[in-house]
């Protein structure tokens, strides 16, 4: 057989077939020289003398001649069956054992020869009743070692000073017995000397590990060696992913811990509530029995849980003056027997107003409405200021354009529906209007235009006339007809194309809006306020114009005397008639 391990047989590998008579007879001595038996040990150890002798003897069938020397087996005299009787009983729960080996084996510190010498000397100096035992001595020494390891974990590297006894005494807790603390000061001096002698290294024997990056394969006392594994390539993404996983795990554990704490708090509150209810029930039972013994006839309202009455809300002024309906009162018990029910009132929160100082809903709504109107007026004033020097031809301008006045030259001829004055007008008014014809040039327009005529109507579609005086005092009247449409000669075929062309389409999307939306309601409020302001301004302007007309009429009557009736045009002038004076 070869030294190499045979490969695995596959269906594709060709294997030669050898007959029995085709095998060459090989000498046994030559065959024995070859390594036909796998030793099972490392290659470096196959040259060991006793191993080679044992392999050769096994190959030749002479097993008794050579063997590997091993130590003889020594039987122990300890009787484990007597020391550890088989009385173990399997527990019923799934948790078989929860203690660690360190908890079961006791104190891990073992006394040495130096400790034994110091232990005997210390006990000889003390009385027999005040001597320390070996277990107590080991417990104190282990406490010193554990405290030094906790406070100085790198003492063997940094070589710091040994911990003082005051620091050791501060670290003593309930784990150290009171009977042992009195020996701690004497034992500390011995422990300190041993610690200084070892270079402030731990006194307890510990396993030796590999220290540093270089591995020492020749040191037989190294307990655990590092595995020679190729280091995984680390990237920032893997580091961030690992940190996220740890952060998520910590959050989940913290949430679970908080949930458990909240569940515990809830169950404790439930337990306390149940205990209180049970106590209340027992006390109510005692009260009931006491009432029966004393023959007290009363209702059982104090034996049941009463509902907490809420504070009644304040009624508005509209319902404050209404008489309250009288309620039927139950039969009252005697004052001596009726228990006084506790009055439950909600404490008033700091910073809140009392019920008497609360504002009414009408006041709040009025204040909000005034604030909205104030904002609207401010916005209108801002728009008027912005539009100074410009003419706003929008559909509904916030700042209305100036009122259009008739030109001094041309005046529109308006057809009046009532050519004769109404019956309610007196003859004095007629005489007054006739007198104004010669005094004021505007009186002619006042006779043709009714008093309800608005100055801001479009006069471009009304024919207008102009009176002027020519040479020799001749009176001339110029006429201006209505503006005709602009006629553009267009091909009838092209005009027919636009016959049914409209700007609007039936396929336009309709936008649905909520009429009670805040923005729409605010827009309607703004429009209504603007209309009210415009109506008020128009009424004020109309009143001022009427007052000015009356004042001018009075001044004219005073200066010119009685009116001249001869200049009137008759009682029924035709539509579009113009008065002329010579």
UniProtKB/Swiss-Prot annotation:
Disordered: annotated segments: 323-351, 539-582
Claim: Glycoprotein is one of the keywords in the record: no
GO cellular component, one term: piccolo histone acetyltransferase complex
UniProt-listed InterPro entries: Enhancer_polycomb, Enhancer_polycomb-like_N
Keywords: Cell cycle, Coiled coil, DNA damage, DNA repair, Nucleus, Transcription, Transcription regulation
Low complexity bias locations: 539-555
Biological process according to GO: DNA repair; regulation of transcription by RNA polymerase II
Main location: nucleus
Localization terms from the record: Nucleus
Coiled coil feature spans: 238-295, 352-385
Subunit structure: Component of the NuA4 histone acetyltransferase complex.
Family: Belongs to the enhancer of polycomb family.
Biological role: Component of the NuA4 histone acetyltransferase complex which is involved in transcriptional activation of selected genes principally by acetylation of nucleosomal histone H4 and H2A. The NuA4 complex is also involved in DNA repair. Involved in gene silencing by neighboring heterochromatin, blockage of the silencing spreading along the chromosome, and required for cell cycle progression through G2/M.
Protein name, as recorded: Enhancer of polycomb-like protein 1
Species in which this protein is naturally found: Aspergillus fumigatus (strain ATCC MYA-4609 / CBS 101355 / FGSC A1100 / Af293) (Neosartorya fumigata)
Gene that specifies this protein: epl1
